[in-house]
UniProtKB/Swiss-Prot annotation:
The gene is BC1L7. A lipid is attached at residue 426 (GPI-anchor amidated asparagine). It is a lipid-anchor; GPI-anchor. GO terms for biological process: cellulose microfibril organization; plant-type cell wall cellulose biosynthetic process. This is COBRA-like protein 6. Glycans are attached at residues 30, 155, 163, 202, 227, 323, 338, 357. It comes from Oryza sativa subsp. japonica (Rice). InterPro entries: COB_C, COBRA_pln.
Amino acid sequence: MAVLGSLLLLILAATLSVAVAYDPLDPNGNITIKWDVMSWTPDGYVAMVTINNYQTYRQIMAPGWTVGWTWARQEVIWSMVGAQATDQGDCSRFKANLPHCCRRTPAVVDLLPGVPYNQQIANCCRGGVLPAYGQAPSAAAAAFQVSVGQAGTTNRTVRLPRNFTLLGPGPGYTCGRARVVPSTVFLTADRRRKTQALMTWNVTCTYSQHLASKYPSCCVSFSSFYNDTIVPCAKCACGCDAHKPCVRSERDGKRLAVTGKKHDANANAHGRGNGVAAAAMAAPLLQCTTHMCPVRVHWHVKLNYREYWRAKITIVNFNYRMNYTGWTLVAQHPNLDNITEVFSFDYKPVVSYGSINDTAMFYGLKYFNDQLMEAGPHGNVQSEVLMRKDARTFTFRQGWAFPRKVYFNGDECQMPPPDSYPYLPNAAPPAAASLVGSAVAMAALVFFLMA
């Protein structure tokens, strides 16, 4: 019985370790790292490495991705184009030309925009930023070229790197083993000739919010026209001990944020950008709130028409040290399959399972509100969504008008307790409630959102 119990525990642990990186709204989302060997050299090979973000609504923000691995033997990196290793390592055994990196476990980062053209290749040099595939599929890829030495020089003698890691930019990603796949076929610029990689292997990395952080990074609050109750984010929704100290006044927040940026610049200038001090200064600097979340999403049921209803979405940033560029918001609600119009946000449906269309991805309009500014008077973006009613399912009762799940930048937000949702008064039908309660609810909502 003891052996059987141990076996069951092992199976359960394995199941949980797989399930923890599974996102039911994006079941096939992953980041794939592809190595294409383009040519052999006297002591190794030249490979084109491509990082494809196949996650529908999770991006990699600045300071960008970091890819690492362990060489199987004593390989070195002679040179790179479009990226660089962060540490050269000990190359003292080489007497003449020194390799770009001699570490057995190199860590590679993207180059910054504006580097000389002879250091660039296609899809490089964006500071490691990768947009979500559902948001910008043509830009959701990065690439660099690496020349590997002291390695195999044929398909039979090459040993694949192992123990791949991916930071995006923080933890949360788990990478599988490198696997040889059919060689990539390329089409020439005139589209009249095909060429083929000499060898190709793939590495698949999946994200787990539970590995990335102990606490959520966002929370959700609710309000409605038919009830003057505003349901706030749950107390300590993002961990009250995780973000200490916090800032009580906007003036202090701005002052500390500027001080942090100057300290960070000085640390980088003196080569201490990766030190403990710099890491501490990069930590979130949050406004003091009861929920202590960097981001709050507010869903307000605003208006009720005969055939339509309208909801207002407001995203508020409480972090004085973070701008969210290219942000994404995902909401799950059964009426999102009948969206008629979205005001001041872009919108795409997220269809994960056949014909089920109950999930929508929202993101900002380019050069208008695609950047959620740091905490303060400009640290919010908002939009309204107009939806056509389905007479078979539509109701304001039992919290039906509020979303089931909300994600910000790919991370699931903490929802309020279901028993706290604004209820529909029994004494008045929805139309009457709309007229009686709108003014009171809107006044309270404005005060709440500005707090």
